[in-house]
């Protein structure tokens, strides 16, 4: 299983679907899957 867009991801949790980047909010400490760079351009 992989983590969908804006779902929790990280070490020991899930890797992001479609090789999306897992970005962590330093203040909150939670990591979620963000859009790939190309997706912002309708890729």
UniProtKB/Swiss-Prot annotation:
Inhibits high-voltage activated calcium channels. Shifts the voltage-dependence for activation towards hyperpolarized membrane potentials for L- (Cav1), P/Q- (Cav2.1/CACNA1A) and R-type (Cav2.3/CACNA1E) calcium currents. Causes immediate agitation and clockwise gyration, followed by the gradual development of general flaccid paralysis when injected intracerebroventricular into mice at dose levels of 5 ug per mouse. Its main location: secreted. InterPro entries: Spidertoxin. The keyword Transport does not apply. GO terms for molecular function: calcium channel regulator activity; ion channel inhibitor activity; toxin activity. The modification Glycine amide is found at residue 43. Keywords: Amidation, Calcium channel impairing toxin, Disulfide bond, Ion channel impairing toxin, Knottin, Neurotoxin, Secreted, Toxin, Voltage-gated calcium channel impairing toxin. It is found in: Secreted. The presence of a 'disulfide through disulfide knot' structurally defines this protein as a knottin. Belongs to the neurotoxin 02 (plectoxin) family. Expressed by the venom gland. One of its GO terms (cellular component) is extracellular region. This is Omega-ctenitoxin-Pr1a. Disulfide bonds join 2-17, 9-22, 16-33, 24-31.
